[in-house]
Amino acid sequence: CFPKVKELVIRSYGGQKVKLTGTSKTLESVDVLLDDEDGSLECTVSAPKVKRVCINGKFAAKSKPLGKCFPNAKRLDITTANIQKVNVTGCKKLKQLQLTDTTQKAIGQINLSKNKKLKSVKITGKLRKTKIVISKKMNKKLVQKLKKTTKKAGAKLIKR
């Protein structure tokens, strides 16, 4: 569609469904802002050069894991009402992850076990009774930080 685009910014109003599809060999940055709670993002794009992804909105049921869409992303900032549908498996180079849950419901489970290169994780939301699954090979400083965060919030850290 736009063969030379490096930065993509989409802002949607009025409950629209946004679809990111196709393949991009030049895209490096993606920002999707859905202003209405009824809007959703269906992400099935293949964009291996993307390094930074910022998504504010709900994920559609047909979305692929973000690691399949953006396998080389180094930074993900996700703000959503359905955080349990955020799947970062496959983001091989992910170093920074920020997840923000916009509801007051319990999150459930977040699986970070495949993301061994993570150096920074920030999870905001109702973490009580949330299970955060991490890798045994994860950065030790990050594990210590996650232990403190999860303990304060009433979440459970599980090593795999």
Roles of regions detected by a PLM:
Residues 11, 21, 33-35, 56, ...:
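Feature marks extracellular polysaccharide-active and adherence modules
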Residues 5, 15, 27-30, 50-52, ...:
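Conserved hydrophobic position(s) of the canonical leucine-rich repeat
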Residues 2, 21-24, 44-47, 66-70, ...:
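Hydrophobic anchor residues at the C-terminal helix/turn of individual leucine-rich repeat
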Residues 1, 12, 23, 41, ...:
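Small-residue (G/S/T/A) turn/hinge positions that recur once per unit in extracellular repeat modules
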Residues 18-20, 41-44, 53, 62-65, ...:
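Canonical leucine-rich repeat
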Residues 1-10, 110:
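Low-complexity/repetitive intrinsically disordered segments
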Residues 31-36, 43-46, 53, 57, ...:
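The feature captures the LRR N-terminal capping module
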Residues 16-20, 24, 107-160:
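Leucine-rich solenoid repeat scaffolds
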